[in-house]
Amino acid sequence: MKVILANPRGLCAGVNMAIDVVDQLLDICTDEKICVYHEIVHNRHVVSRFVDRGVTFVESIAEVPDGAIVVFSAHGVSPAIRQEARDRNLTAVDATCPLVTKVHAEAIRYSKRGWQILLVGHADHQEVIGTRGEAPDAIQVVESPEDIPHLRIEDPAKLVYLTQTTLSTDDANVIIDALKEAFPEIKAPPGGDICYATTNRQKAVRALAPACDLVLVVGSRNSSNSVRLTEISENVGTAARLIDDLSEIEDHWFDDVKKLLVTAGASAPDDLVNDLVIHLVERFGGEVEQWDVDHETVEFGLPGSLKTVMRDRGIDPSGRRIVIDQSAELHEILDSRGIPHTTVDLTIGASG
């Protein structure tokens, strides 16, 4: 069986930043209680590993003990949550993905100008809850084209749509096209809102899945972008399974599978993918090929609130960046085990 690794896959820069924020707080605030508001990212393994290191995850600021540090997750929070933390004089560290922050800024800007905002996304997703909280009187959530007849529009000439960053581009475009048909004057967000990592991982599956017999997506079931990857594979005609880790696979899945595509959601740690690939090759034989559909060269700076915590404790944060390079580690592991592997370059450039 040939195991094909989709590239890009797995951790994005925003998730890496959020995980790094908690890692660094654990290293420098050894005698302080660290809480995270909501799951830092939507991955069971990431959360459980932090719990094992003493982090407490909460669903309300009231659960945070006095004097503790509270971290806002990668999905972002509403102004009301930030104010609640300030009212309690908690040390708050913001690990919101910068691309989510961009959507928040757009919501604030358009609402201040008196525009109505149609937010395309899942109403119960933490990111949408946080964005909606920036301008609750101006924002209406649109989950499907069926919601459009029920929208309350005052002036179609002052109407803009924004989107949840982790949506399937296919699903989002269906809703956006329906909005444009219903409201021809509706304005699009500058540069689009669906993040580069979501787009690239979906593009890779859309391009590679038709050449494969089965797709395995590593990710948790509450990860929106991971679920979307399985749906995209199925939409192009290739069966797909979403797994948290290799413990969930069953041997009969691979009967008659000659080409297996492996990818991962943007919140799935690299070691889960690495362990899966090694297990598959050692169990079923074969070789590994990485098929590069895009090259991501993305890095984020540390959040300002984390820099403040570091400086307050005598640590200089200068020059620190969050950089992604997931392929090198896996190639080294495969080499060390003598597993044949090659890279196929299908790219037409770099993105992100």
Spell out what each predicted region is.
Residues A328-G352:
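Generic N-terminal targeting/processing segments that precede catalytic cores or assembly contacts
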